[in-house]
């Protein structure tokens, strides 16, 4: 979310960065991987000068304090869903990770389809950004 700064009130902007790291074999298949996200909040004044930066840790570091189940009605906390995704893509290539079909859910997020039942059983969060991050990490690992 964002808010414009005024003469009386600080403005704010949220930054959202997804990232991935992978270990791949000679054929580009994932041997190990991790995904995570940072969401710092930035405050700024009417001149556009940054006045505050708040960062409470990555989603994995926050663990249960991210409160995806409590406030989002999710099937599992973010770090648990991330682990499901990480485990699911082990042994896959970039093309196979990108081939995981997604559909837009009611909240507007790209989530895995029922075609990937093993993934959907433990991961109902948006995955399209992580598919992209993993693909870039694989390209960088070669």
Label every model-predicted segment.
Residues 1-142:
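Active-site- and interface-proximal helix/loop "cap" or "latch" segments in soluble metabolic
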